[in-house]
């Protein structure tokens, strides 16, 4: 019931949950929008420690296919955004503005790459873009790198 209300809402609220409940609810909401591979999670401890992570689990079957030399199209966006979140927080804590700016530019490079039509297979399957291309994990990361380097 709550999931339906959250999905249909326009936002503007805070949904406080205990750790396990938040994990389950966030996964269900993310799945309703298409892909867990786009969702990150931030855990904050009472003593001020932070952990940034991709909310999805491991992709063991993709890894085994990769080891066999087969084409894989694993979406790294949540992992990249977990790193950028951690980099930004480190920059804030240590007052390193350049690190915060780099994190933002890397995130924008990811978004721009997808908006340009270059994406992994999971996004390709849901995208309504006309000029889109499904690429391997390595090709996607290379495209992000090229976009980032052009904007540094």
Go through each PLM region and give its residues.
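Internal helix-turn-beta structural module
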Residues: 68-74, 89-152
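Short, small-residue-biased leader/transition segments that mark boundaries at the very start
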Residues: 1-2
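Glycine-rich phosphate/nucleotide-binding loop
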Residues: 6-105, 112-113
